[in-house]
């Protein structure tokens, strides 16, 4: 049983719905007509996407230079009576890595501002054992305090925070970032390693009350494979390479005969959960392990998960609903194809990137700079979440990583 808990907070949304806080109104693009057309100019498009992230990062900062960008804005998440501002650490990690990909001085400054916030919430967690939580309130950070909005500690989230901190250490040489990454990794190893129930790997994390999530997720183990491999390179400690191999072997065990990769296990930690089949398990298995065997998963994706919604074409989030495009997935599918470099892959990747640029310009609730999460409101993930056509930092960051050809699961070689 695998959940997409790093991307959204369905429990928060359900509570808000029950309280009558969500309205059906949508907010139109505030300044789209004033933004230059970047659909035919990839460099301009990238520059505008970074401008979107810059504005989000600078919106919520404290007096010590720590900043935390809200994850979603506009449309479903912004109505006349309610504004959803939580910041998901998965999105924050992607933004950090996207900034290091371009690497301008202001990019590194903003990446450090987010990274310092991640260290701040880690150091000030109520339990204080190296964990971070799913999401935090940026208004709290602005006031110099930690306000947890998503209290779960999910393994995939931890690995993404770790990869962001590892990337910051690689970019800046500041030891505090590597120390924070190692703390995260030790939490993962201590609390989620499963070497009893084959296939061995890492379980889903913990709920707020300390209840362990005993299923194992392909996506989470892919995250760990990438993160622990980075730690092995940065620390020189081969134990992290050994642990990365455990996670990678779990992912291998989830690959079906037709090439696709299943989502993980049921509660027994061994029985394969075959529904739904998510896009992440296909693309991230390739990016996170670097294993050519998952090229078959990319081919399966192209055959089974591509959606067309009006002028937009690209992957959906899973096989549950292939009527809408998930632009975050367009980003990591484009990056996977670009890095694989097989016959026709470059053209396919560019087509996906062109679709994102079109959404950047024309999508409902867009601003001409950032990228919305989906082509239409209400995309069903199959895991109990709905996704909406609202501006999203994580989607925008994946676009920038794909445009740069920068794999967040691996450290840069330059």
What are these regions (language model features)?
Residues 37-77, 86-90, 120-146, 152-156, ...:
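Extended ligand-binding clefts on enzyme/binding-domain cores
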Residues 84, 91-101, 113-117, 160-164:
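Non-membrane alpha-helical segments in proteins
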Residues 2-16:
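N-terminal export and membrane-targeting signals
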Residues 96-105, 111, 282-283, 337, ...:
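Alpha-helical support elements that line or immediately flank enzyme active sites
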Residues 100, 166, 170, 229-233:
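Tandem alpha-helical RNA-recognition repeat domains
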Residues 149, 170-171:
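Aromatic-anchored glycine-rich loop motif in surface-exposed flexible loops
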Residues 21-40:
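C-terminal region of N-terminal signal peptides and the immediate post-cleavage residues
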